[in-house]
Amino acid sequence: MPVTGFDIALRRPLAGGRAFGAAGPYEELKGRLRFAVDPAHPANRAITDVELAPRNARGRVEFAADVSILLPVDLHRCRGRILLDVVNRGNAVAVPNLNHATRPVFGPGSDPNPPIDPGDGWLMGRGFVIVSCGWQCDVPEIPGLLRLRAPEARGRDGSPLRGRVYTQLQAAEAVPHFFLSDRGHIPYPAADLDEPDAVLLARDLPDAEPEAIPRSRWRFARLEDGRVVADPRYVWLQGGFAKGRLFQIAYTAVGAPILGFGMVALRDSVAWLKHSASAEGNPAPGVLRWAYAYGRSQTGRLLRTMIHLDLNRDEAGRRALDGVIVNVAGGMRGEFNDRFGQNSKDRPHMMRHLEPFQIEPRERLKVMLTNTSAEYHRGDGSLIHTDPDGARDVAHGPDVRVYHFAGTEHGLGNWPPTDRVASPADPAGWIERSQNIRGVVNYGRLLRACLVNLDRWAAEGVEPPPSRHPRVEDGSAVPPEALAKMFDRIPGSRYPRHHALPQRQDFSNLPPEPGRAYGSLVSAVDEDGNELAGIALPEVAVPLATHTGWNLRHPDIGGTEQLLLFAGSMIPFPRTWREREAAGDPRLSIEERYRSREEYLARVRQAAVALAQEGYLLEEDVELSVTFAARLWDHLTDPSSTR
């Protein structure tokens, strides 16, 4: 068994010993899993540079991962299900997303072991054992984040490797220097501070012609107390970096940790829980049979990469995962198995790993691909179900479902409505401001239904609801520019004049050479600007506003022609017909649509019940949908509220 030990550093009751329905009280175990894997085993051969890893006396490669496990105190009350929470940049995401809970924010000086907010306890009430496993060796050096401690690849003479790195840097305010990484991650240090072939580019749009910044104007350095101090982890620019501009740097770095062991840690941690005995440190021996993974955004892309590399069977040939929910990953994978890869890189125009966009697991792994409108307007969302040119639909196999959550943004909505949101998982604490109010629709209810349907599909053979997404054949998938005419009629909608679509690129040299754009498509919209395709939650199906998957950057943070990546918009309907007439808004006002709050909520309930009957929503979440809609009604009909 590749897991050689579990060192428990913290054991405590969850939520003060609160009982979660039939599963009873839970406890949290937090510590470190130790691994020793055979680098020559076929199960590990897909790992880049595995042959260059240092080995112990038994010829094994050792590494370790931080782990948090939530499980019932009485294991007899466990339903035999594991949910692998594929942590995002060191942060747990499954409980916050599926339980409507608050995720702790880790930063310098924060408590590394804050109490876990269980939210409404939904996952625990269903008896899931939830394991959160660190898989990144480059997460910011902040206590509390779950990380991987992986070995570095070495040359035949034992020296550290050198290689080319290409990364993008952008700030919400003017800065004198940048850390050479995304969101404070541990960077690859420059091998030569004076490297003449290092390149720094600046762009105003992701696909615009770059401006090459003369080498004499920038250095590998940081500004400290007014002095420029040489530092291989930073880049400094004479005159500073302007807010909102996109800066891309290509340079030679030194020191390459073996990133692919992160996927091995995920696989083997699940296999250990499913198959090992208590003598091997398993806290739940003999009770866990089915395992599912939830990954969102970055970690959804990681799951896509694991499936692509066929990394789901351990050294004993045993299947780890039985099903996965790949949420808001669009059509991308990532540099999760690359020499000098960057785990946090997440912009499609910076990615070498795009094609193939479709996923077909090589074994009977059940896969649900869920995306919001933001991934479609980002440009890669539609490519998981069309050909690369966007000319025709491409069908998936029987073990895959594709769901588009209409009118939603990348995150699970923002409440109360605002145009200012903290940049996700960013230790710098940047506040991202948008030109429109951000999206408010919380699609966590749809994810809960996906997990229940995934479990029934894998464990009982019950088919889940059919895929639902924009399609070329019925005209519901259209180029993004096709929406401009509609939105230009809505006062103050600020529809983007330019969508920077993903391009075919030659990454044999860095910076890469761009080529032809992919055929990216988005959902067509109705006369209110709401999307016609996908799964529409009641707040979208019975609307009080136009809900979109796009929003532009605000002048306060620069780059005003760029999409604020991941952001959606809420564009409220006028309250009254008088407001509508005064504004010249073609959309009916709230008072023209609904005679009263009671009528509106009755229609919301009807839409929620219909969605539950189709299987896309759980019956238990019908009333939650009504509650969310009532909150939105009260806000948008209050004359004193900010719209």
What are these regions (language model features)?
Residues P2-R643:
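C-terminal His-loop and adjacent cap/lid subdomain of alpha/beta-hydrolase
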